[in-house]
């Protein structure tokens, strides 16, 4: 290790020392030293280090140099005692033990002379024990000579550098694997990984890019999640779960952009970490690098006791791979090997005198090795070539075996260290996770308890408040129902009185109808009498006339037939009237029966009305709406109510207080809704019954009107009869007058043929006129009759259609109500099912929560057990590692003993005769040693199997821990999902409540609409009744209505004019407001432009100010440069002065020397010196002049620059003052503009308010206009109806008048 690396390591140690120096004095006390040792993982050597540094003085303090010396001393001592022989086992070659041959024949020796080489399994088993050192020392104190480590800090740190240089031989892929595993298992930085040295090989960008290009990922310079999984699989992080991969991706993605860049990947996976070394050893337990073959050969040459080339290079024999286990091989194999390597006379070589090996017997490899060794030492012929080829082959083979053994040993060490790190890290992670889970669960439980308490208090307060509100509402409703009951009773009494009056009126009307019938029969009999009289009179009058009289008689017969037909029609109409009267009586009897039933059922109806909670004002104001419902409806409602309440009461017992309160609320709400539905159904049934009663009443009224019209028709017919009688009387008088005239004319004899013709003409004209009038009467009566019948049919059809339509509406509404009730019942059932499901879910959630608690407790216990097992396993691993280290040390001692025995065996070979007995003893000792070694190997193998089984159990425990952790995570996810389900259920209940509220609102809206429609129908019926009752009065009020219509038209015209005026004024106001706003907008735009210009000016001024400040800064920089130049000039002047003084001193010194020389020198030398002195004086003078001129120039330049700088500063100050004044002015102007804008905004707000007021007034006027238009439309409709009624009355009058005229 060079000096730079040593200084760097000392600096690192100094940084750690300073980090523990809390006082900052450079000294550490006992507590700070313990903290530093804990950081350096020297807890095992802490007492020795404290005793070395502090001694008996516990309150002493130590500086860094003292700590460094004590640290090196303690570390070297620990290296002497605790470093096991595994270092020498891989630093030194394993020399095979030589055994005494079993049979000796002359110069030839047969049998094994060395131990069989260990198999690969044994090599790996030996390597497993290498990382664990032992502190035990052999009791006899016999220790083999080994390479000791240096006790200095340089040697300790050089070990790290050697290891690092050895690790550089690994490939990039293996480096990736190691780094990835280290990153995976040491994410918290507390594993057992050693501190990375500074010269560790870092992964470059090129290597990472090469891996990415090999996999075909990271084309855009970043990785997504799938590409990261591919890279992790490639570099050795295989079998990662999805959660671990997500955690690694989130950790690498530092900027949270969803991708991992190259820098993030390299810094996240391959950055160096400082980790504490394991507690079992004080030296870094890193995998030992492979030594080079040259170094191993050198050490073997150094350590070998045999002077031969064979023992120095490859051991005591060659061609080991041809050995079949007995130390011998067939000569054919050796010859085949030599012939393969190019030696063709292998048979001759084996049969030479020097080697003298038989081709029929088996060839001993040890003897061949010794023979070849001797030949190499003696001669240099072809035998040497065979020996060299054999050496080369053996060396290559041994190199391969050594490399494999070292690799397997390093791999086993790394696996053991990694398993220890994983165990410790898993224990820590499990502890941390359990602690975090416990804290999270406790915090969640506390939060849930607090939430439940808050909700419980809120629900209690809400329930108390709602109960108080309900009590108040019940009291108010009770008072209101009492008032309604009193009203109903009073209305019942008034209705009974009205019924009595209507019954009396009906009787009176029946009596009048019977009287009118009698009068009608009398009139008919009088008409028949008058008709007979008229027939007789006409027959008597016109008997004496000529044959033309027969035509008159025929016409009279026709007239009589027509009258008979009319009489028949009158009888039919009378029959029709009788039928209508009978139907009217039936309807009256049905109405009286209904009233008696209603009066009987008034008591239970009143009881039922006491339970009504929510009724509309229209129902309470209308007395007909207070009647009770039918018993069937009541029974159905009671049955559904009982079923629903029973279903609600039969629910499962409450699970928690919150669910109980929610269930009570839902139950109360449901009862209230059912009660509302019952009340609504009652009101609708009452309304429809009342509407049926009103229809019946209307029918009675219409029938009364019809009877009245018939009475009027009868009176009109009576008038017609009277008129006919008067006309008959007039005709009788005219006939009598005519007869008298005829008699007078006939008696006077003055009548001639002309008078008879004139009489005949007059008679013919009279007959024609009479016939024409009769035909006109007949036609008019038939038309009026047809019209009356058609009107009656139309009216009856309309009434029947109306009744049917109303019945259809009632039935459809009843069906709709039934469907609605069924839908509501289904909704109630669905709500009950939802409540049951929610309750079941809540129970399941609570069961799952309890189960989770139990699982958590069980997992805690299992984790504690696993933790204890892991600790036991780690302790067992440490114990077994120490035992393995002890066994390895014993093996090393045995190998050293074997080495000594081989040395002694070589001496015995030189002294054959004297060493026979000693060779036998050595053979026995070797056999014992072999047996002991075999026993040790067997014991070590068993312990290794035990360790492997324990490792397997530890792995299974770790797998179980991972399964437990996954179960915990799944359980937490289940808890989260259950909480989400709970929240979703609560949301669903809230949504269901909102849906119920919406349904209730829709029901209320529909009820209000139905009530409005019913009110409209009632008003229409009332209006119809009023119009029917006031039909007679409307004829008189027609003129008034026309006047009113004219007034309304005038008023409408005035309103239209006012509307036009208002619209005109509104338009004018809008136009003025728009013009004002446009002007303001224009002014604001102009002001905005001005402000923009000013802002641009300000920006330009700011730019100019920035430029000036920049110039000022440049001037200041120039001034600073000038000052530095001035200082430099002054320094130069000072230097010049100093040089001048030095030159003068030197000059004086030279003059003194010259004077001294002149005293002893010659004249020539003096003259020469004088010339030199003159030249020197001239040079000094020139130099002084030059310095003076430079100083003057510098002073002049400095003055000029100072003057320029002062001028620039003055001009800059002036410009700054001007800019500040301009800025002040602009600020004042901007403030004024801001104030103006504020005033303008206030004006705009006022104008907006005025506009809103105008819009409001306009809307009000529009509403008033709409109301007036509606009133006008309704008045026009009423006037149109009145006109129609007047026209109908006029038609009736026209029909009735001709009949009276004909009569």
From Swiss-Prot:
Which residues of the sequence carry a binding annotation for Ca(2+)?
Answer: 253, 255, 257, 259, 264
Q: Name one GO cellular component term.
A: centrosome
- Keyword presence, Iron: no
Q: Where is the composition biased (Polar residues)?
A: 592-617, 1159-1175
Record field: transmembrane: none
Query: Where in or outside the cell is it found?
Result: Cytoplasm, Cytoskeleton, Microtubule organizing center, Centrosome; Cytoplasm
State the gene name recorded for this protein.
Ninl
Q: Which keywords describe this protein according to UniProt? A: Calcium, Coiled coil, Cytoplasm, Cytoskeleton, Metal-binding, Microtubule, Phosphoprotein, Repeat
- What are the GO MF terms of this UniProt record? calcium ion binding
User: Which protein are we looking at?
Assistant: Ninein-like protein
One annotated GO biological process = eye photoreceptor cell development
Q: Which domain of life is it from?
A: Eukaryota
Q: Which SMART domains match?
A: EFh
- List the residue ranges forming a coiled coil, or say none: 464-590, 660-791, 821-876, 919-1146, 1202-1278
Keyword field contains Ribosomal protein: no
Query: What positions does the domain EF-hand occupy?
Result: 8-43, 61-77, 203-238, 240-275
Q: What happens when the gene is disrupted?
A: Morpholino knockdown of the protein results in severe morphological defects including ventrally curved body axis, ventriculomegaly, pronephric cysts, expanded melanophores, small eyes and circling swimming behavior. In addition, morphans display shorter retinal photoreceptor outer segments (OS). In ninl morphants, in the inner segment (IS) malformations are also found including swollen Golgi complexes with enlarged and distended cisternae, accumulation of vesicle-like structures throughout the IS, large vacuoles and dispersed mitochondria.
Q: Where is it mostly found?
A: cytoplasm
Please give the function described in this protein's UniProt entry. Answer: Required for the intracellular transport of organelles and vesicles, and is essential for the photoreceptor's outer segments formation, maintenance and function.
* Region called Disordered, residue ranges: 107-135, 592-634, 1156-1181
